[in-house]
């Protein structure tokens, strides 16, 4: 096969095919005695004549992919009459041993090397700063190298600028493998060249800090993270004691896992392909589950939390993004329009039935407020928020406290009525007022998911029957609202806030009887009876800050004007379709 190519007519070519140095050029055109078939100076280990013969006999070596060395390597010189494509039109023979090229090639006014073999950094390494596991950047430059015969192709010392290993390797060694991917504990390496022998995954040693293309990664050994991270840029299990070559298989252990520091819960990955250990750090408070919140709240006393916060706010590291401010009547529940019959007239229902259901629910609301929530004592001392008077609470145990004999009702019904702010004066009286609001808070948190247990068996059945009749009359209005409320409540970065014109105690009774306690913690309920909704919005902004997005959902003019003043988006609810559209927008995460 070689003889067929070498005997093709070339008027300026002389020499035999058995010449180790390849075909010789006519001396009338060039003084050089020989040149390599591919026109390059490649220094390799000398081979014996028997190896040359066996290599030449291998038919699979007749082709060498042109993509092996990139698009610009071994490009023909357009002005040179002895370019390799004219000598060998279709094939090149890298297995034929070259001889040192003549130094008189410079007489033709061209450099001795082609563009791909220049010492310039035309093919510099491509740094990839986004690679976290130390994959060498020069690996991508060798991705296109491919041979069909498994022939090893070593790199010449004169080719350091082409596909170089970067600044860490000053002089590439002959016979060194072109690349080695270090990928989580295993390296796809070759023994002496590209795809020579059996290609397999070998456990080669990782690069140390002096062999990396990236000389320094930021270390996390300072400050409060010292217990989680090593002080050195590379963890100990990434480093080896010996300064080995990137492709030299290591006989000693490569994976040296360090012991985690005391007090840090860590779990090492048992997969042999993993070189790092996963440290399970505690989650942030905003991401904790409901069970974790309950467990954290149960041991609150043991952590010495004595002072009460009148206006609770989210923790500093909270990632709260959106606050949904809801109106209650005619937005979440249908109550006032039942009493007036306007809902029945609008939707074609029976007005007397509607009014009857409204009156029954109103009676149940005030009965619950008077019996269990001290509404008779607190009606004239209404508060905007449940914690507004908590600063007057001395933390006394109320398990054996008798609210009926402490003298508070007599003082409340005296001529000196409560002021507009709900504060009358007197340390003793204010403490008793704070006791009642604290007891209301305890009852709400205890029975918000079990209102039937608070009502008793007889009233529980009447309450469930009334709820079912109202839902049937209102075409499941409350169910549609609860779907949107529950979706918001399930998000860790969103919160539901209730602002109602009803007094605080009756509003709490409404929330409990309509089954809304699960989506409205008592700290998120505000009464706008005394100060108006716009002032409530200002308190909410002061509580959560101005970095979050506020969305107001209601049906009235007052909440719409308050939202407009504070540049808050307003979602009007006037029908079932508005609630369904709201839930759809929440599902698509538009809100």
From Swiss-Prot:
UniProt record, GO biological process: animal organ morphogenesis; aorta morphogenesis; branching involved in ureteric bud morphogenesis; cell fate commitment; cochlea morphogenesis; double-strand break repair; embryonic skeletal system morphogenesis; epithelial cell proliferation
Disulphides: none
Tissue: Extensively expressed in cranial placodes, branchial arches, CNS and developing eye and nose.
Catalysed reaction, written as an equation: O-phospho-L-tyrosyl-[protein] + H2O = L-tyrosyl-[protein] + phosphate; O-phospho-L-seryl-[protein] + H2O = L-seryl-[protein] + phosphate; O-phospho-L-threonyl-[protein] + H2O = L-threonyl-[protein] + phosphate
Disruption outcome: Complete perinatal lethality in homozygotes, due to severe craniofacial and skeletal defects, combined with an absence of thymus, kidneys, parotid glands and ears. Mice present multiple skeletal defects in skull, neck, rib and pelvic girdle, but no major defects in muscle development. Otic anomalies involve the inner, middle and outer ears, with malformed auricles and eardrums, malformations of the incus, malleus, and stapes, while the tympanic cavity never formed. Likewise, mice display an absence of inner ear structures.
Region ranges (Disordered): 1-95, 150-169, 239-319
Biased segments, Basic and acidic residues type: 287-302
Cofactor binding summary note: Binds 1 Mg(2+) ion per subunit.
Description of post-translational modifications: Sumoylated with SUMO1.
Ranges annotated as biased composition (Polar residues): 28-53, 253-286
Cofactor(s) required, per the database record: Mg(2+)
Compositional bias annotation for Pro residues: 78-87
Keyword Transcription: yes
Compositionally biased spans, kind Low complexity: 8-23, 56-75, 240-252
An example molecular function term from Gene Ontology annotations: protein tyrosine phosphatase activity
GO cellular component, one term: protein-DNA complex
Associated clinical condition: A spontaneous mutation leading to decreased Eya1 expression gives rise to the Eya1-bor phenotype. It is characterized by circling behavior and deafness, due to gross morphological abnormalities of the inner ear, and dysmorphic or missing kidneys. This autosomal recessive trait resembles human branchio-oto-renal (BOR) syndrome.
Complex and partners: Probably interacts with SIX2, SIX4 and SIX5. Interacts with H2AX in response to DNA damage. Interacts with SIX3; promotes EYA1 translocation to the nucleus.
Similarity section: Belongs to the HAD-like hydrolase superfamily. EYA family.
Described purpose of this protein according to its UniProt entry: Functions both as protein phosphatase and as transcriptional coactivator for SIX1, and probably also for SIX2, SIX4 and SIX5. Tyrosine phosphatase that dephosphorylates 'Tyr-142' of histone H2AX (H2AXY142ph) and promotes efficient DNA repair via the recruitment of DNA repair complexes containing MDC1. 'Tyr-142' phosphorylation of histone H2AX plays a central role in DNA repair and acts as a mark that distinguishes between apoptotic and repair responses to genotoxic stress. Its function as histone phosphatase may contribute to its function in transcription regulation during organogenesis.
Protein name as it appears in the record: Protein phosphatase EYA1
Gene name, Swiss-Prot/TrEMBL: Eya1
